[in-house]
Amino acid sequence: MADLAKIVEDLSSLTVLEAAELAKLLEEKWGVSAAAAVAVAAGPAGGGAAAPAAEEQTEFTVVLASAGDKKIEVIKEVRAITGLGLKEAKDLVEGAPKPVKESVAKDEAEKLKAQLEKAGAKVELK
């Protein structure tokens, strides 16, 4: 147990950048993806909530279907919405269809959809 306590203490002292680098190294070492684990963990919770809300959906996922002709404008808008860095936003836009924002209220989802469409993107709400 002393070894585990030492590991916890060491991990707690990492900066955000160091923690991100550690995550990348562990993903490579173990051949896994942290994004896949988050999607799997979020899947059952979303599925259980969707059944009772069959009458009217209250939470939406804003999905970028395609960037359209104005990719740079769409990347700028994705950065503004998500707070992602330039490379991450570019990867998201180029990897479309991808979710831009998940579990948002209907009003916010409609607003985000309008922003992205104004920039030239094709957007879906799910």
UniProtKB/Swiss-Prot annotation:
The UniProt record lists the keyword Ribosomal protein: yes
A GO molecular-function descriptor: mRNA binding
GO BP: any one term: translation
Pfam families with a match to the protein in the record: Ribosomal_L12, Ribosomal_L12_N
InterPro entries registered for this protein in UniProt: Ribosomal_bL12 (IPR000206), Ribosomal_bL12_C (IPR013823), Ribosomal_bL12_C/ClpS-like (IPR014719), Ribosomal_bL12_oligo (IPR008932), Ribosomal_bL12_oligo_N_sf (IPR036235)
Entry GO terms, CC: cytosolic large ribosomal subunit
Keywords noted in UniProt: Ribonucleoprotein, Ribosomal protein
Coiled-coil residues: none
Role of this protein: Forms part of the ribosomal stalk which helps the ribosome interact with GTP-bound translation factors. Is thus essential for accurate translation.
Family: Belongs to the bacterial ribosomal protein bL12 family.
Assembly with partners or alone: Homodimer. Part of the ribosomal stalk of the 50S ribosomal subunit. Forms a multimeric L10(L12)X complex, where L10 forms an elongated spine to which 2 to 4 L12 dimers bind in a sequential fashion. Binds GTP-bound translation factors.
Protein name (record): Large ribosomal subunit protein bL12
Organism: Methylorubrum populi (strain ATCC BAA-705 / NCIMB 13946 / BJ001) (Methylobacterium populi)
Designated gene of the protein: rplL
